[in-house]
Regions:
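NTP-dependent small-molecule kinase module
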Residues: 155-221
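Hydrophobic anchor at the beta1->P-loop junction of P-loop NTPases
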Residues: 26
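P-loop (Walker A) phosphate-binding loop of NTP-binding proteins
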Residues: 29
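A glycine- and Lys/Arg-enriched "phosphate-lid" helix/loop adjacent to the NTP-binding pocket
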Residues: 108-182
Length: 221
């Protein structure tokens, strides 16, 4: 801990950047490292985490087995759950970190399922109208951190973390999601964006990577 502080001071990192009330969102494909980064930052600096409610989604396991049947219901659950979660974090004091926002659910995951015709035109229009209504009432993030990661690395991490429902996710599905992430961030204007190549960073054990991460976050806030 002492070494962290010495190096952080040398590189210009200030804890004050995260001590103020800020909303940081962490985005990235399945297996990109969102939960790990959220947990790491919150553990190191006492921030408040808001994790994705995967385990609370009663449709998710069925969705991975039969996407066409369960896509709309699963995405609708995530949209409404994320809306309630984001309203909750707006009332929190201090800096909060959210592991995947409702923007990402709609712009990446639901849009991909609609393009694959797993969500039909009628359901999609209703979903999108609801998303636009929700998003207009929410304060956007102060910083969006995008964890960019190649599909090969995503597959390795998915296998290693061993979540049973994720093991049969098709590689083309992950490829399509990565494409949508790049499309979305090319036109994203809600907040500053910090792009991190997570297949090349080791902020957990590498002190230089860790200090560089803190410097970049501070720079964008």
């Amino acid at each position: 801990a002492t070494l962290d502080l010495v190096c952080a001071a040398r590189w210009g990192y200030k804890r004050g950047a995260l001590a103020k009330k800020k909303f940081i969102a962490i985005a990235g494909n399945i297996g990109a490292g969102k939960t790990e980064l959220t947990s790491f930052l919150c553990r190191k600096y006492g921030l408040t985490p808001f994790f994705e409610p995967n385990e609370a989604n009663p449709y998710l396991a069925d969705f991975y087995k039969d996407m066409k049947t369960w896509a709309f219901r699963s995405q609708l659950f995530f949209l409404t759950a994320k809306f309630r979660l984001q309203r909750q974090l707006e009332r929190s004091s201090g800096t909060t970190l959210q592991d995947r926002t409702l923007y990402e659910d709609a712009e990446i995951f639901a849009k991909n399922l609609h393009r694959q015709r797993y969500i039909d035109k009628r359901d999609w229009q209703m979903y999108w109208d609801l998303y636009e209504t929700f998003s207009q009432t929410l304060a956007p993030p102060d910083l969006m951190i995008y964890l960019r990661c190649p599909v090969k690395t995503l597959r390795q991490r998915i296998r290693l973390r061993g979540r049973e429902m994720e093991q049969d996710i098709p590689t083309p599905y992950l490829n399509r999601l990565n494409t949508l992430y790049e499309e979305w961030f090319s036109g994203y204007k809600l907040s500053p964006v910090l792009v991190l190549p997570t297949d090349k960073l080791d902020y957990v054990t590498d002190l230089v990577d860790r200090v560089d991460l803190f410097r970049q976050i501070e720079k964008h806030l």
